Amino acid sequence: MHALGRTPALTLLIFINIFVSGSRCTDKNQTIQNDSSSPLTQVNTTVSVQIGTKALLCCFSIPLTKAVLITWIIKLRDLPSCTILYKVDTKTIETSCLDRNITWASTPDHSPELQISAVTLQHEGTYTCETVTPEGNFGRVYDLQVLVPPEVTYFPGKNRTAVCEAMAGKPAAQISWTPDGDCVTTSESHSNGTVTVRSTCHWEQNNVSAVSCIVSHSTGNKSLFIELNQGSTTTTTSLLTILYVKMVLLGIILLHVGFAFFQKRNVIRT
């Protein structure tokens, strides 16, 4: 896209409005990174939004009195592209998008922001707002990425081991342990783009009775406390107890046999 008749005053206006517009369209559920290397007439932005929350995407904040046409071009990962447009002079709205979750945040004559009311994995893709003005065309491109918090489970294994699993997260979660152990971590990718991470750890030290599993993810971190199954230590103790009981019983039997033997010997002598 090309800008026509660009002036220093217009350049300053665009810089200021990018900042204000970006702050209006950002909430605690989405993270924005701007690509400052893009031309002034087009800003490329990466937006990360947690699944199930609302996403709000902005155009250039140009006064509608200067706009002729505002068009949102939506290209989702696995669906055909569609458009939502607003003709300023006739106040006409046209759309080819079938997803009712994707709408104008307000009325386009008031604000051209696009809203996704409940983000799903199917909403990942590119969202481009093109604003046509007499001074030129201005665009803002969003690469929308959906974050999925993993479901975290854990359980103690056998012989001083523990297992921690972060299921179906996007992106993949990171798992660490305190204290450090001898760990094996595996990951499994799913067809919907989520990843399951599983970490199994073993601790040799007998003085380690409990450990913590720390799951780190873009949507938040979790720390889990796990008591270790003592395993072989418990078995050894049980064996020693059984051996001790057997030795005591053997001693009692020998004592009875010895007593009976000496009693019989005394009877024979008399």
From Swiss-Prot:
It is a single-pass type I membrane protein. Glycans are attached at residues 44, 192, 221. The keyword Transmembrane helix applies. Residues 1-25 form the signal peptide. The chain crosses the membrane at residues 242-262. One of its GO terms (biological process) is regulation of neuroinflammatory response. GO terms for molecular function: signaling receptor activity. Gene3D superfamilies: Immunoglobulins. One of its GO terms (cellular component) is membrane. It holds the Pfam family C2-set_2. Disulfide bonds join 59-129, 164-213. Keywords: Disulfide bond, Glycoprotein, Immunoglobulin domain, Membrane, Receptor, Repeat, Signal, Transmembrane, Transmembrane helix. It is found in: Membrane. Residues 134-229 form the Ig-like C2-type domain. The keyword Magnesium does not apply. May not be a receptor for the CD200/OX2 cell surface glycoprotein. This is Cell surface glycoprotein CD200 receptor 5. It comes from Mus musculus (Mouse). The lineage of its organism: Eukaryota, Metazoa, Chordata, Craniata, Vertebrata.
